[in-house]
Amino acid sequence: MSNYVVIDLEMCRTGNNYTGEEVGLPNETIQIGAVRLDENLEIAGQFMTYVSPQYGYISDFIHRMTGISGRDIQNAPQMKEALEHFMSWLPSPDIEMISWSYTDRAQIEREMEVKCIRLDGMEELMRGWIDCQEEFSRKLKNRKRFNLTDALVIADIPYVGEAHDGLTDAYNTALLFKKLRLDPDFRINEYYRKSLEPKSPALTFSLGDMLSGMGVAADSAQSCSADRN
């Protein structure tokens, strides 16, 4: 069985003083969270580091959403050093990476390109990337792209921790990935399952239809009365 590592990034927008759009980098990583899975897809290790952005800053919105503050990233490593720490944490070079969507993979690739980061083994790591969001949609036979919180509800997996924390999101993605791979029936939330069942045919007549019918009935009654007379 392959070695799996689930990763999740938290990001901020690039700042006004350093326009990230000018270098093609509208977002920057401010946190990397990851968990390692053993041969039974149980969580066997975890990794977390904050990342100091080169262009961006922690806005009030990002702080409220992620809980990450300027103090958290003040002495944090920049992206190159953070990725070096992450690579050294990996248990072996034979790793399949997992994230909730390809957004995390694309962000790493883009930041490495813009910041001229070169790391041994990173190119190989990118090749075996698994998009858990896509795998989840395929399992449901649904083209919709679900967010992680909704996917966990549908899969009947209690959410652990607070959303938009890199380590927490990686942990919850790992729980969902395990169910996708090890539960052949992939039992889903009963309420969600019932919502997919065909509904009873709706009443389609209108008030006008009803009154029109009443008019026909009245005309028929009058006609019968006239015939009797």
Regions found by a protein language model. Give the residues of each.
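Acidic, divalent-metal-coordinating active-site segment for phosphoryl/phosphodiester hydrolysis
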Residues: 165-178
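Histidine/lysine/aspartate-rich catalytic loop segments that bind and position anionic ligands
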Residues: 117-139
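Active-site catalytic microenvironments for nucleophilic, acid-base chemistry
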Residues: 111-115, 154, 179-183
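Conserved non-catalytic scaffold segment of RNase H-like nuclease domains
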Residues: 2-113, 161
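Active-site-proximal helix-loop-helix substrate-binding element of RNase H-like nuclease domains
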Residues: 50, 57-59, 63-66, 70-73, ...
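Active-site flanking residues adjacent to catalytic metal/cofactor-binding acidic residues
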Residues: 7, 130, 168
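Short, glycine/acidic-enriched loop or turn micro-motifs at the edges of active sites
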Residues: 11-13, 134, 172
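Acidic two-metal-ion nuclease catalytic site recognized across multiple nuclease folds
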Residues: 175-229
